[in-house]
Amino acid sequence: MPEAHMQPAKLQTSLPTTDHGSKKPVSCYLPPLSNAHPMCIEVQNAQNCSSAAATLEPSIISDTCFYKPITKDQLSSRSELNTVRLKCLNSLRGWKILNQLSLT
């Protein structure tokens, strides 16, 4: 029996349309990544990233980003807070798509 992550999956999300910023539901059937539509690959990667983060202990999802929110009280200065945010920017690119999926 094939493992669950090897089977095609179906995701439904909303993508912006040209109709005054409205969103139209779109279903993506995800074949193996080599044949998938680029948008579906991006959504699947975001979903896989979130699944991996959910299985980790809730302290660190990478060597620079913390899974728990960092407050100003935990850092010595505003510039240090901004530095942490900048370091996390690249690894959190997929979260925007993930958040859009969870809202639909």
UniProtKB/Swiss-Prot annotation:
Keywords: Chromosomal rearrangement. Residues 1-23 are annotated as: Disordered. Expressed at low steady-state level in adult placenta, testis, ovary, prostate, fetal kidney, spleen and skeletal muscle. Disulfide bonds: none annotated. The keyword Iron-sulfur does not apply. Residues 10-19 have a biased composition (Polar residues). The keyword Cell division does not apply. It is linked to A chromosomal aberration involving DIRC1 is associated with familial clear cell renal carcinoma. Translocation t(2;3)(q33;q21). This is Disrupted in renal carcinoma protein 1. It comes from Homo sapiens. The gene is DIRC1.
